Amino acid sequence: MIPERYAPYTYALFRIVVGMLFFFFGMQKLAGWFGGQAAPLMSLQSAAGLVETVCGFLIMVGLFTRPAAFLASGEMAVAFWYIHVFTIAMGKGLGFPAGLVPQNNGGVDAVLFCFTFLYICSRGAGLLSIDGAMGKPRGVL
């Protein structure tokens, strides 16, 4: 059991790792890094990659954390509904309600990222962040 006094540090580690993972997803789409394939420049996938790269980096370093996390959460909600439900699930003929289940439509990552970023948005940057170093008061964007 981790003592309560370490909670701010474990949250900082959580924010940094989640931001880093999202940054990696973005760079896969934008530049083909980390085993990915670069998306065509003027495509929806490259736009998503840009949001993921920028927001992931901002969340990782803790700069403009709340707005970046809010935008990232919204992008993941759109990804789940537009890509996983309407495109993949309906393309497979899953229908309702099976098509809404993330395990059936491949949207588990999108749902987890969506609600993780919503939590980060509500909590803020915390320790080990540029926002914290700049002295932004709690609860302020």
Locate predicted features.
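Extended, low-polarity transmembrane helix blocks
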Residues: M1-A31, L44-L50, V54, V61-L141
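Transmembrane alpha-helix entry/boundary detector in multi-pass membrane proteins
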Residues: A38-L44
